[in-house]
Amino acid sequence: MGKNILLLLLGLSFVIGFLQALRCLECDMLNSDGICEKGNSTCEAKEDQECGILVVSQGVDILFGMQDCSSHCLNKTFHHYNLTLDFTCCHDQSLCNEF
């Protein structure tokens, strides 16, 4: 009987852990040191969202970044003249879009 209760509790803990919502870091303006200067908070990703981060750089110098819950997230890097825009998405764990 004790084993059955233990297995039931273990199964429930897995279900509860699985059902926890994905939380993402949210920042409207990350400076070049990765410090949020505007809009520092977290957001709860909806069903069609994941955590996203955008880092804009020029050569090896990071200019600024942004973090959010994103519906249209892509893992892609774009080059435009001398600027690089690096979009990264994640959904494997909460707060995974850390700078």
Swiss-Prot record:
Signal peptide limits: 1-21
Disulfide bridge partners, by residue number: C24-C51, C27-C36, C43-C69, C73-C89, C90-C96
InterPro entries attached to this UniProt entry: LY6_UPA_recep-like
The keyword Mitochondrion appears for this protein: no
Pfam families assigned to the protein according to its UniProt record, in alphabetical order: UPAR_LY6 (PF00021)
Predominant place of localization: secreted
Keywords: Disulfide bond, Glycoprotein, Secreted, Signal
Record localization: Secreted
Cellular component aspect of the GO annotation: extracellular region
Keyword Glycoprotein: yes
Sugar attachment sites: N40, N75, N82
Chain ranges of the UPAR/Ly6 domain: 22-99
Subunit structure: Monomer.
Family of this protein: Belongs to the PATE family.
Protein name (record): Prostate and testis expressed protein 14
Gene source species: Rattus norvegicus
Lineage of the species this protein comes from: Eukaryota, Metazoa, Chordata, Craniata, Vertebrata
